[in-house]
From Swiss-Prot:
Region feature Activation loop, mapped onto this chain: 153-182
Catalytic activity: L-seryl-[protein] + ATP = O-phospho-L-seryl-[protein] + ADP + H(+); L-threonyl-[protein] + ATP = O-phospho-L-threonyl-[protein] + ADP + H(+)
Domain notes: The activation loop within the kinase domain is the target of phosphorylation/activation by upstream protein kinases. The PPI motif mediates the interaction with the ABI (abscisic acid-insensitive) phosphatases.
Residue list for modification Phosphoserine: S157
GO terms (BP aspect): response to calcium ion; signal transduction
A GO molecular-function descriptor: protein serine kinase activity
EC number per UniProt: 2.7.11.1
Residues that hold ATP according to the record: L18, G19, K20, G21, T22, F23, A24, K25, V26, K41
Family: Belongs to the protein kinase superfamily. CAMK Ser/Thr protein kinase family. SNF1 subfamily.
Residue ranges of the region described as PPI: 336-366
Residues annotated as the enzyme's active site: D135
Name used for this protein in its record: CBL-interacting serine/threonine-protein kinase 5
Keywords linked to the UniProt accession: ATP-binding, Kinase, Manganese, Nucleotide-binding, Phosphoprotein, Serine/threonine-protein kinase, Transferase
Amino acid sequence: MEEERRVLFGKYEMGRLLGKGTFAKVYYGKEIIGGECVAIKVINKDQVMKRPGMMEQIKREISIMKLVRHPNIVELKEVMATKTKIFFVMEFVKGGELFCKISKGKLHEDAARRYFQQLISAVDYCHSRGVSHRDLKPENLLLDENGDLKISDFGLSALPEQILQDGLLHTQCGTPAYVAPEVLKKKGYDGAKADIWSCGVVLYVLLAGCLPFQDENLMNMYRKIFRADFEFPPWFSPEARRLISKLLVVDPDRRISIPAIMRTPWLRKNFTPPLAFKIDEPICSQSSKNNEEEEEDGDCENQTEPISPKFFNAFEFISSMSSGFDLSSLFESKRKVQSVFTSRSSATEVMEKIETVTKEMNMKVKRTKDFKVKMEGKTEGRKGRLSMTAEVFEVAPEISVVEFCKSAGDTLEYDRLYEEEVRPALNDIVWSWHGDNNNTSSEDC
């Protein structure tokens, strides 16, 4: 039988392929008994095992998802495993992304309020369980058949095609546009307070139909975020303006808390808090010996007291399975876009690699900031000594964006050095190069 139609452990019939990432495929499924529709994420264990620590992340993921069962969070129903695959059986959400609704235009304030009420209720519940999401955005918020909002895992939220619209950023695994300034600055941060900032950006987008901080140039967008530099459209009500102004506060210690959000007149209007699900059955299941593959011992553990770190990102494992993190649309069209790449290495590791590589190229290397380095050639070129800078930004946990640009010297010499020496030498730390296009021209910093 073809994989798309096979029966899984005698419990689920697997149907059409919904989408796929680097490590996983997601299928439409249906319970054999009961007929409930589900989404089944199939993870290739061999590929996961090649990444140190990732199997532990799966087990932690299971424990944490058991903590956050809530009407406004996509439910993880159970996890099963064989010797070669891991299966996440998830609630199937039929209504698609909230992003798709926003892409058609801004929402009426009452509709935006309803979605925001549900978002805050779910986030508050997560925080009460010691879990922070850290990548809240409309692409990760799904709507069920009743129009109710559900916070999604990243793998599922990346499946529906995204219709490009001016004013909204479109990336598969997250965007700095929704990230709190303290996270972008690579300082220690409170995950719960960072979530509140992201909720503020989401509310603004719901009401405006565009981002509060938007610029084709990534650095300019960062500057706006660091200053909370945004404007309200004229149709925003005074109450909505007051709330957003308290959500988008740069200092996390002065940012409004969720209990205070719950007390605001704007949110309390027609608000009925949902009741959280009762956790009364184990999520982990063992595979049957009669199935297509044997069960591997230890792939699914029952824990009476799941242990998770404070404000652990409950969804980051599935996020890591997505296939790309393309930020090319954020950069100036004239800049040579292959001067930007993303890395799964830490910012510190990336900086050390850049310094080592460029020193081996006989360049003078000097750090100007913790995560910015200037490199200068030791010989005169056509237009003096070639000089370039590299800056590393951690835009999400375990994801760094690196930007190279020429600060002095001849453009052709820079292009040749970058293409023939820098890029090949950095390949082992690169997750993806962005927007390779050999016909574009470089632009100085």
